[in-house]
């Protein structure tokens, strides 16, 4: 290494002497003033050469320390490249001094050209080394890297030329200074990248990059990662550019308010989805107690309704906020209409949920319950999809400024998709409503058929009602029995209707006795209505006495007298009073009317009205027949319901017990199988253990013999490797000396040519 340092110093001194001789020759050909300036320039160059020599000595010392941990080939090649670079830089400086430096930019350009020449020289050396190794693939890869570095240096040279041209043509204003600064920074980055690639190429050339494929894959992956990062950065820049160009129409407060409202709507939707899921679970696992199950379903539906109403209010608020934004009128109107349509869909969904609440109060069979559960699951999925759409819409609202055409179209498509999801959900609710109404219609039809059968039985039991009609009409003229005959209360216990056609007559079997009905009514309501007939008779007598006191005389049995006094004011007032009382009961159904405690008083009032108004058909007599029938029907319905609930409970108990039996049986069977398998494994392991012990003894004997042979082979191999390493070191030393001699010869030839050219 010391010999190499001495040779390097000698070459540098020789080069300096050549420069001095050429400079003196030029001084002799010039005048005195120019000669002094050239001498000063030569002196400065000589001082620079000495400083460079000292720097080279320091680098050689550091390289010497580093070479103790590296092979000789790497150190030799590194010094060779350093020497060639220094020589080329010296040659460049000599030629530049002969022409004269115009500016600092020309000097930088010359340094880059010197680096370019060194790159070409390194490329030729790399090609020679690779031709020796016959590795075409590695040579192509190295050549490609050299070409890339060359392109980068050419780009740097072009940038310097452009910078020099701009410096000549333009002034030193601030804009030009900034441009020049950016170009210089770009050149510096390219130079650093090229330097790093040269170092990597140098290491690969001198150490032999055998893992070329692995290195190439690693390089490719790094480039792809960088490319992805750049693409992400470009997208971010484009997004930032769009945001800067369009501007933000909403201030921070408005954006925060919209975001909070959208989050609130999202929470409402999630709560509604959870409620629907809970409702589905409740419907699939119907509670044993039907009343408790109905109450639970009612509470869930009411909770869903509240959630939807809250979401509707949030949408209204969002609608108001969005209407105040400074946007285009067309886009604002379109958005307003979409939000209003979503609001209407919410309200329709709320109404449908109320209707569903009414329909789900009754009990349904297993098939109907399964169908409803399936439809509720579909509705839940639709609402979840709508929730996802709202989340996406929230993100877009938070990041967007004024709506341009692309954002408006995207927003419109998302709102339309949410609308379709809600329409599908509402369609599912409507389908549930239709199915439940169909079931109610079927039940109503069944009840109607039962009532028609009862009516036919009444007609068959009293087929001779027409024959009795004349008797009832004649008996009606008698004052003592007027009201009972109007009600159709006969002495035989049967009931009929007076002044009716054959098709409209309704009768009941004789098994429903009027006396029994009256006794039952007196037991329920006390002594005031102990006898319906007596009460009605007393009412008629009181009415007769009142009329006789007012008019003097009145004969109710005479049709002519009744017709002459029917327009009296007292009778009209009484009729109007009774009509007003009866009109108050107009909203009640027949079942509700019969089950009232004052049903007897209502019958008396209705009979009085029909008597005083001379009604052609007595409807109140029909109503009196159905009281016990309706009560028995209600009691039968309660008994049926109790029986169904009891059967359902017993079925569930039996199912649970059978499930427990099946579970214990499966557990016992599984344990038996595991016990048998473990027994087989234990037996096999014992047998295998015996075989393994015998095999281990055999392997131990072979191992001892192999160890003895291995000790002899290790000694022979160590001696062979020592001889091999000695031969390799000797060959590398000889190769380093040969390459150094070649490099020195080439450098001397170049210096000699330059010297001759300067004469």
Swiss-Prot record:
Its main location: endoplasmic reticulum. Keywords: Coiled coil, Cytoplasm, Endoplasmic reticulum, Nucleus, Repeat, Signal. The gene is TSA1. Residues 63-74 have a biased composition (Polar residues). Residues 142-461, 685-734 form a coiled coil. It comes from the Eukaryota. Binds calcium through the EFE repeats. Homomultimer. Interacts (via C-terminal domain) with GIP1, CSN1 (via N-terminal domain) and TSK (via TPR repeats). It is found in: Endoplasmic reticulum lumen; Nucleus envelope; Cytoplasm. Involved in seedling development in the dark. May be involved, when interacting with TSK, in the organization of spindle microtubules and may participate, when interacting with GIP1, in structural links between the nuclear envelope and the cytoskeleton. The keyword Repeat applies. Residues 1-29 form the signal peptide. Residues 91-473 are annotated as: 10 X approximate EFE repeat. Transmembrane segments: none annotated. Residues 55-74, 154-184, 200-219, 271-332, 393-414 are annotated as: Disordered. EFE repeat repeats lie at residues 91-138, 139-176, 177-215, 216-254, 255-293, 294-329, 330-368, 369-407, 408-443, 444-473. This is TSK-associating protein 1. Induction: Up-regulated by wounding and jasmonic acid treatment. It comes from Arabidopsis thaliana (Mouse-ear cress). One of its GO terms (biological process) is defense response to fungus. GO terms for cellular component: chloroplast thylakoid membrane; endoplasmic reticulum lumen; nuclear envelope; peroxisome; plant-type vacuole; secretory vesicle.
């Amino acid at each position: 290494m010391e010999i190499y340092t001495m040779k390097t110093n000698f070459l540098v001194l020789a080069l300096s002497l050549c420069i001095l001789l050429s400079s003196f020759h030029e001084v002799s050909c010039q005048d005195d003033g120019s000669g002094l300036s050239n001498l000063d320039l030569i002196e400065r160059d000589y001082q620079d050469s000495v400083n460079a020599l000292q720097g080279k000595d320091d680098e050689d010392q550091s390289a010497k320390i580093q070479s103790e941990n590296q092979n000789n080939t790497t150190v030799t090649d590194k010094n060779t490249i350093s020497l060639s670079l220094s020589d080329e830089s010296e040659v460049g400086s000599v030629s530049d001094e002969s022409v004269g430096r115009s500016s600092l930019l020309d000097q930088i350009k010359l340094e880059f050209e010197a680096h370019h020449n060194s790159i070409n020289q390194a490329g030729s050396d790399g090609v020679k080394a690779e031709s020796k190794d016959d590795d075409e693939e590695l040579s192509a890869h190295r050549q490609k890297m050299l070409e890339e570095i060359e392109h980068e240096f050419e780009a740097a040279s072009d940038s310097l030329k452009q910078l020099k041209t701009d410096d000549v043509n333009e002034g030193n204003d601030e804009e030009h200074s900034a441009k020049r600064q950016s170009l210089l920074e770009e050149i510096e980055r390219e130079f650093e990248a090229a330097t790093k690639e040269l170092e990597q190429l140098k290491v690969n050339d001198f150490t032999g990059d055998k893992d070329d494929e692995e290195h190439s894959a690693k390089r490719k992956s790094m480039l792809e990662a960088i490319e992805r990062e750049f693409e992400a950065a470009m997208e971010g820049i484009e997004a930032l550019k769009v945001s800067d160009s369009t501007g933000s129409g909403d201030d921070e407060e408005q954006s925060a308010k919209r975001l909070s409202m959208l989050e609130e709507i999202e929470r409402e939707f999630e709560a509604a989805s959870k409620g629907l899921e809970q409702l589905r679970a409740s419907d699939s696992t119907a509670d044993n107690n039907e009343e408790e199950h109905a109450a639970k379903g009612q509470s869930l539906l009411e909770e869903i309704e509240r959630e939807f109403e809250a979401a509707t209010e949030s949408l209204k608020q969002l609608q108001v906020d969005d209407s105040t934004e400074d946007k285009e009128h067309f886009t604002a109107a379109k958005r307003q209409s979409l939000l209003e349509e979503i609001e209407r869909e919410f309200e329709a969904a709320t109404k449908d949920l109320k209707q569903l609440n009414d329909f789900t109060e009754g009990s349904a069979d297993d098939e109907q319950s399964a169908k409803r559960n399936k439809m509720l699951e579909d509705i839940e999925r639709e609402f979840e999809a709508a929730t996802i759409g709202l989340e996406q819409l929230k993100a877009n609202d938070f990041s967007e400024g004024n709506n341009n055409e692309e954002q408006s179209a995207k927003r419109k498509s998302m709102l339309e998709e949410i609308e379709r999801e809600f329409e599908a959900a509402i369609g599912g609710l409507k389908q549930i409503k239709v199915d439940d109404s169909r079931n109610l219609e079927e039940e109503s039809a069944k009840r109607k058929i039962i009532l028609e059968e009862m009516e036919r039985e009444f007609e068959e039991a009293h087929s001779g009602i027409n024959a009795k009609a004349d008797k009832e009409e004649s008996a009606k003229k008698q004052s003592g029995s007027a009201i009972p005959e109007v009600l159709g209360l006969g002495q035989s216990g049967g009931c009929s209707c007076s002044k009716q056609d054959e098709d409209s007559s309704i009768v009941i079997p004789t098994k429903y006795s009027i006396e029994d009905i009256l006794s039952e009514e007196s037991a329920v309501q006390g002594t005031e209505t102990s006898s319906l007939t007596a009460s009605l008779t007393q009412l008629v007598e009181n009415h007769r006495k009142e009329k006789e006191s007012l008019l003097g005389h009145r004969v109710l049995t005479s049709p002519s007298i009744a017709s002459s006094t029917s327009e009296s004011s007292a009778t009209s007032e009484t009729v109007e009073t009774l009509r007003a009382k009866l009109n108050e009961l107009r909203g009640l159904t027949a079942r509700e009317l019969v089950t009232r405690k004052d049903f007897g008083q209502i019958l008396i009032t209705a009979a009085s009205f029909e008597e005083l108004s001379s009604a052609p058909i007595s409807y109140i007599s029909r109503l009196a027949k159905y009281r016990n029938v309706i009560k028995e029907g209600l009691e039968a319905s309660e008994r049926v319901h109790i029986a169904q609930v009891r059967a359902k409970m017993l079925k569930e108990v039996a199912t649970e017990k059978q499930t427990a039996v099946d579970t214990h049986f499966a557990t016992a069977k599984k344990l038996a199988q595991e016990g048998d398998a473990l027994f087989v494994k234990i037996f096999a392991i014992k047998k295998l253990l015996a075989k393994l012990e015998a095999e281990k003894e055999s392997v131990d004997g072979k191992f001892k013999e192999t160890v003895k042979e291995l000790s002899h082979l290790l000694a022979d191999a160590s001696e062979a490797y020592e001889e091999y390493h000695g031969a390799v070191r000797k060959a590398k030393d000889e190769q380093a000396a040969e390459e150094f001699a070649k490099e020195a010869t080439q450098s001397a030839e170049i210096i000699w040519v330059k010297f001759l050219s300067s004469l």
